[in-house]
């Protein structure tokens, strides 16, 4: 079976896609298996504090186990990544490390690069346009993910730096599959999302961009996970 590796947002677990969207219906219509992952507030990282190997579990152990249990294809043409919010970062991290393993990636209000988003907005894109809502949101994110991430500025140049990894992998001759990226103008991550969509395009990534109305919520994800699966056909 073709398979969609689907990551949820911060503070959630693997059941949320099934509970808050119609992903089971959409997957049945598309004839695709879906493997949902959720790692609470870990940013899908092997954490800085504590020995919690969330990214290793997601990207190494989970595929090995589920392919042992179920007849899921290993053909890159049959493998797809997607994520909401923090799950967007986890999906991107997997995608930039192993671009040859996937046909595409879908991000729905997906966090694009943690080390360029804080902690004090000093690294944030479009600083002149930052609103009080953005300031509050970044402060909340810093607190929520601090035990996993540590100081986000220390991630620059590591495997957790998505922009840096794209440049590094391209220099090594890696080819990246196409990307579907959607963000709503009412989203609290809108400035970040718009900036990174344009940045990844400038780095040579083929991006199908959607900027429409919608907030950082499951209603938006439900709409765009369906659009993403339709886009794959």
Task: Tell what function each PLM region has.
Residues 1-233:
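Non-catalytic cap/lid and distal C-terminal segments of serine-dependent acyl enzymes
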